[in-house]
A protein has these predicted regions:
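Hydrophobic core of transmembrane alpha-helices in multi-pass small-molecule transporters
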Residues: 117-136
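C-terminal ends and interior cores of transmembrane alpha-helices
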Residues: 95-113, 128
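Hydrophobic alpha-helical transmembrane and interfacial-helix anchor sites in secondary transporters
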Residues: 82, 141, 175-176
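Transmembrane alpha-helical cores of Major Facilitator Superfamily
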Residues: 34, 66-70, 98, 156-164, ...
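A late C-terminal transmembrane helix in Major Facilitator Superfamily
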Residues: 148-180, 187-191
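Cytoplasmic membrane-interface "Motif A"-like loop-to-helix N-cap segments
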Residues: 84-98
Length: 246
């Protein structure tokens, strides 16, 4: 229904940008995008350096970078398909931190980490290939904006939060922490752990919002609902006849 709310030559200005930024209903997904990819980005940046520190040659290091990419693509396609198939976002996205937390914990606290060559490479490869929920979140933002105008802006804002997370990721591993990066891996462990309650909070938040809308909607008569559909000034995801996906 919202596809007719603007034409293809209508510009989006500062007012629309401000409204999208202040749409607190999408803040939980922005927060997810901000922290969800920090772990992968951090280790991905230093993966070749870590492999060389383990004693691999440049040629071997290049070859050993292939398995994480294959695993990453496989998980990306699989988890995105599962989310659409099950029509579920929060719980499916939980697969990512539940997969990553044990791995980064082993990488951080196992005494053989950084010393036992192939075991260390395997752990890093599995961590780098973790389920990637970016595609789920991009679609999630688009659906929960419920407006053609705000959809494009909100998607751009989401990507801005992802990029801010990437900037933070570049500053977690430090020179004084080389080569085992114990401090950095502790931070990554806490970040991955934080994603679990954040996803659960997001699920509960959208269920609560839907329940609040449902109470008001159910109090209306059919005539009142029809009048609301035609004349209400509510826009986007604030409309009572819109249900948040979670």
């Amino acid at each position: 229904p919202t596809k007719g709310s603007m034409n293809n030559r209508q510009a989006l200005g500062i007012k629309e940008l401000g409204a999208s930024l202040m749409d607190y209903n999408l803040w939980p997904i922005f927060a997810i995008g901000f922290i969800a990819h920090i772990g992968k980005s951090t280790m991905g940046t230093y993966f070749t350096l870590m492999n060389k520190e383990l004693g691999f040659s440049t040629f071997e290091t290049n070859l050993l970078a292939i398995p994480p990419s294959i695993l990453h693509i496989s998980f990306l396609l699989g988890i995105t398909w599962l989310s659409e198939r099950a029509n579920e976002r929060s719980f499916v996205s939980l697969v990512a931190p539940l997969y990553a937390v044990p791995l980064i914990a082993i990488i951080r606290w196992w005494h053989g980490s950084g010393k036992q060559v192939w075991a260390t490479w395997m752990l890093s490869t599995l961590f780098l290939g973790q389920p990637y929920i970016h595609a789920i979140c991009v679609a999630w933002v688009s659906r929960n904006s419920n407006s053609v105008g705000s959809r494009s802006i909100c998607s751009a804002l989401y990507n801005m939060f992802v990029q801010m997370g990437a900037i933070i990721a570049l500053n977690i591993y430090r020179e004084d922490d080389f080569p085992l990066y114990k401090k950095g891996n502790t931070i990554l462990f806490l970040i991955e752990l934080l994603l679990i309650p954040l996803l659960l909070f997001t699920k509960c938040f959208y269920i609560w919002k839907n329940n609040q809308k449902g109470k008001l909607w159910n109090k209306m008569t059919e005539e009142e609902r029809e009048y609301y559909r035609k004349h209400s000034t509510d826009r986007g995801n604030e409309r009572l006849d819109f249900v948040f996906e979670h």
